[in-house]
Amino acid sequence: MNRREFFGVTLLGLTRKSGREIVGGFVHDTAALGHRLRDGTRFPAPQRTQKVPIVIVGGGIAGLSAAWRLQKRRAEFVVLEMEDSTGGNARADRNDTTAFPWAAHYVPVPGPRATLVRELFEELGVLESGAWNERYLCQAPQERLFLHGRWQEGLEPQVGPTRRDRDQFARFEARVDAARATGQFTIPMALGARPSPLDAKSMADWLREERLDSPWLRWSIDYGCRDDYGARAEATSAWAGLHYFAGRERQEMGPLTWPEGNGWITDRLLERVGGAVRTRQMVYRITRKGRQWSVVTPDREWQADVVIFAAPSFLASRVIENGPATPDFEYSPWLTANVWLDRWPQERGLPPAWDNVFFDSPSLGYVVATHQSLRTFIPRTVWTYYWALDRGTPRENRIWLLTQRWQTLRDRVLADLSRAHPDVRDCATRVDICRMGHAMIRPTPGFLTSAARHQLTAARDRLFYAHSDLSGISIFEEAQYRGVTAADAALRAISG
């Protein structure tokens, strides 16, 4: 179903007059700011110069993780963030009822190889004496799926698949177990990834080769690819498609989550490094001057010994003198919406879960911000709704997303929610929408082995790249790993 067909069908449910207007608008809308870099806008020359050993460009999780590492090593640094707040995809807000996320909203319980995540979580009290703090483990019920007009437990379809479909689910799980056993599908991915022929083909092609053609299985795999990559199986490398499943333990006790999602981690990192963070500082030029780097913002020129570039890698060619091109880097656009509800909508089937998914919907569903509350009853709540624009090319979808009116997108969100909650419009008071044109990297076929990716992962003259897009996987663990390893490289460069 394309966008036009989707609007034609779902907006039928919103043609009646509502008793009240649902307010809201676009939030964290920084496309115009970023496009100044794209369009080569001339900026005023800075009037001040300041020296610092290390400059971190970008205040998302990668940049904040680099700062966390440097702070622990007592290094001097500054973090320059273009927007008015840090966190990137791990950003959050709050109303009178609850905090709520704008994108990243959980971290799977990290396995033994995710040592950096475990170190941080021990410091934050999430991991205590080897045990996970139950306060942060997602409470039951965790997931439900809206299918055939009712909610069912879990995300694997229960009603509809035949014995043949079930056999294919079992065969696929066996393939995942075999992939996991190779040790090449790790988190962080750099610890295990090796050149693989799986990277040369799409996940859809691999499924055809394996004769896994169940439409129910295909929906589940598409959902996984959309969830982590913002792309369907046709546009995802088979290596990355398998990594979504094989990179985690088969039996997990998590995930770890908070009302504000990964914004909770952002806040904890800022408590430690916030004094070195400078927001509203657009870095528009980075050049080499003798033995130092010149990092220029409209406010001032920073002279640094080392630069950690933790902004999205596609910006390198626009900002860094002779910066590398990134033709293989594709980014998925996303829409997220926070729907404020002054009462709970009607339910059909199971009670609300933390993660609520609609079968065969363009969206990925919604999470409930108040799910972790210890109160027995909360009359109001906030639902965070996720839509990865995965039909058509990323560029086409970005243009479409940025040209839509807020009212049109608001009605689209409510229409999708109304398939399971017919009275949602009567319960909603506000819908705020965040448009993210380059929300996450797409690991397209060939990306893992691409020359552009390998060029960026190699050190270059005291400039180290640190964004999660270097992994091809836009998740917290990868962003943290890239930030910390870049910080370690920066420390070695300075001490050497």
Describe every region a protein language model picked out.
Residues 15-43, 148, 154-157, 346-496:
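Conserved flavin/dinucleotide-binding core of flavoenzymes
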Residues 279-384, 420:
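Mid-domain catalytic core of redox enzymes
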Residues 181-285:
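Active-site/ligand-binding neighborhood in enzyme catalytic cores
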Residues 48-54, 380:
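A short, charged/proline- and glycine-enriched loop
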Residues 52-79:
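N-terminal Rossmann-like FAD-binding beta1-loop-alpha1 element of flavoenzymes
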Residues 97-177:
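Dinucleotide-binding Rossmann-like beta1-alpha1 core, especially the glycine-rich loop
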